[in-house]
Amino acid sequence: MRSFFLLLLLSLTSIVNAQSLIGGKNILKTNLSSDALKNYNLTFERSLNRFMSVSLSYRKMNKQKLPLKALAKQFIENPAIDFDDFQIGNSAITAEARFYLGVSKMSGLYIAPYARMATFDLTVPFDYTYSPASPTPNVTLPAIPMHAELDGTIRSTSFGVYTGMQFQLLTKLVLDLWIIGGHYGTSNGKLTFVAPNGTPALALNELKKTIDQTKTAPFSLTTSTTSNGVVTDAAGPWAGIRGLGITLGFRF
């Protein structure tokens, strides 16, 4: 019986050691779920020991029309915003540490705390009207339709944790499934509109009133007029869900 357990222990040790060496200590991978939304990303992960690794990710989405308009309308309420021409782009750097609960290096169930810095490039179009001043008393001139596009960036810093499972499919091929997690932090930014020459001050004041009607709780917007346009400062908490990701990688 003792010989049997000794043989079993030696066999398990050999399996663990063999698995820990399969493919190498590094993995280069991309999230296929994110790629499908043209939000391209690349992650480099390196094993520190059997139970821990560190990784660094970069993602980039070129500016494009808003991909999830229905969802955005739930968080940004203003009938003057033209969501059909709303544009967004983003880039982010994410650093994380992974703690694997299995017996193989960079394989099995894991828990991963992470930190993320992101930048969002926005173009927010507004359609509004303003009534010009009448040179004749008691005469109201018809309202003039106007269009303005606010451009700028929002930057966020957040921290979170998520869980997932990573599988060694082949000697060099890895499948990483993000299950569920999330992050929380802060954000701030500025959007500006530079008016064409000759734009009346009344039109800029009306644009400010239109922007002030935007409901973006829990974010706060502070808008002011300038000599040639409008500036909107944005600030507030930043939260997000991380999960349901399918990532494929090359191990070396």
Regions found by a protein language model. Name each.
Residues 20-36:
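Short N-terminal segments immediately surrounding and downstream of signal-peptide cleavage
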Residues 1-24, 248, 252:
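Bacterial Sec-dependent N-terminal signal peptides
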Residues 101-123:
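Ordered, amphipathic secondary-structure segments that act as subunit-interaction surfaces
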Residues 28-32, 44, 54-57, 95-97, ...:
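Membrane-embedded beta-strand positions of outer-membrane beta-barrel proteins
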Residues 51-54, 105-106, 171-175:
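Repeated loop/turn-to-beta-strand initiation elements of outer-membrane beta-barrel proteins
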Residues 19-21, 40-55, 59, 98:
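Feature captures outer-membrane beta-barrel proteins of Gram-negative bacteria and organelles
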Residues 30-33, 63-92, 120-156, 184-243:
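Extracellular/periplasm-exposed beta-strand and loop segments of Gram-negative cell-envelope proteins
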Residues 98, 238-252:
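Outer-membrane beta-barrel "beta-signal"
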